[in-house]
Every structure is written in structure tokens, then in C-alpha cells.
A protein has these predicted regions:
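N-terminal secretory signal peptides that target proteins for export/translocation
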Residues: 1-5
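A short, N-terminal "cap"/entry segment at the start of jelly-roll beta-barrel domains
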Residues: 23-65, 109, 152-161
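Double-stranded beta-helix
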Residues: 30-32, 106, 126-161
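His-enriched metal-coordination microenvironments in redox/metal-binding proteins
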Residues: 46, 59-64, 78-89
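Short acidic-glycine-tyrosine-enriched beta hairpin
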Residues: 58-60, 95, 101-122
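Glycine- and acidic-residue-biased ligand/ion/polar-headgroup-sensing regions
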Residues: 72-75, 81-102
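Short beta-strand His + acidic residue motifs that chelate non-heme Fe in jelly-roll/DSBH
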Residues: 77-79, 97-98, 119, 124-130
Length: 161
């Protein structure tokens, strides 16, 4: 288990390195106009197609982290949990969020721009889109993700990016 956690932490650190570097300096204020938010491919712990921008912090280290995730149409983040709480704010599009061990589209909450969700640590949850969405996630690092069903973990899929 500890080897898996260490490997996950190392993988997260490497995956975020390209995106996190401008946000790592925390000794001054950060102002990022919308046209300067730079998205890149999300790390392999998310299904292919997602993009990420690290606005503040280092997701692989302790401390405050602010991420933006861009999901394409018909995107699903399968049921999973984190050891830290997540605070989601919808920037654009509609993100559907639900709790549980299976994706229940009828039981999901539709969050439009300005919508907010608080997901406590270890809460089993999932998210999906119909037409795409951009969501901001605030959390206390280090970031981790544990899929309920191992077969849903994109890091274990053949041909993982």
C-alpha cells in the first residue's frame, strides 16, 4: 500500500510539473486573467480528453492547491474518492456530480456556471458532462485519487498515455 501511495505521489508530481511551475512561487500574490490560464493534457489519473491548469500550489505537496479542469462533451470521471476534501466551482458548461459507487445519471446534481459542490474527504463520488465543462477545484494537497473499481482507473488501461 505504501509503495502504491509513494508511486502515486511521484507520478502526480511528475504529471503536474509542467503545469505547476508558474504557480509554485507563493511569496507573492497571484493574478491570472482568463486569457492567461494555460491548459495542458491532464495527468493519466484522469480519463483521456481532460485538460488541466494549475493556478496555485503544488498538487504533489502539502498546502493549498487551485486547479482548473476542462472536460470535453460526454466525459465521465468514474466513481472515486480522495483523502482530502474538494471544493468545486463551475466556471463554464454544466457538470453533473453524484455520490456513490456507480454512476447514476438520474441521481446526479446538475451544476451550471457559478454552481458549487463540497465533497468531503473519502466520499465516493463521480462526475460527468453532456456538452463539456470547466470546473475549478480547491483542495489541500497533496492530491490523490482512488477509483472504486480498479478497472475504471485509467492508469491501468492498455495504451495509457
Amino acid at each position: 500500500m505504501f509503495t502504491t501511495v509513494r508511486s502515486l505521489t511521484a507520478a502526480v508530481a511528475l504529471a503536474f510539473a509542467f503545469a505547476a511551475s508558474p504557480a509554485l512561487a507563493q511569496d507573492h500574490h497571484i493574478v491570472t486573467p482568463p486569457d492567461q490560464v494555460k491548459f495542458g493534457p491532464a495527468p493519466p489519473f484522469l480519463p483521456p480528453g481532460a485538460k488541466i491548469a494549475v493556478l496555485q500550489g503544488d498538487p504533489s505537496a502539502s498546502g493549498p492547491v487551485v486547479l482548473r479542469l476542462q472536460f470535453p462533451a460526454n466525459f465521465v470521471v468514474p466513481p472515486h474518492w480522495h483523502s482530502m476534501a474538494e471544493r468545486l466551482t463551475i466556471i463554464s458548461g454544466t457538470l453533473y456530480v453524484g455520490a456513490g459507487d456507480t454512476v447514476d445519471r438520474a441521481g446526479s446534481a446538475a451544476l451550471a456556471p457559478g454552481g458549487y459542490a463540497y465533497l468531503p474527504a473519502k466520499m465516493h463520488h463521480y462526475a460527468w458532462t453532456k456538452a463539456g465543462a470547466v470546473v475549478q477545484i480547491n483542495l489541500e494537497g497533496p492530491f490523490d485519487i482512488f477509483y472504486i473499481n480498479a478497472s475504471d482507473d485509467p492508469r491501468k488501461a492498455p495504451g495509457t498515455r
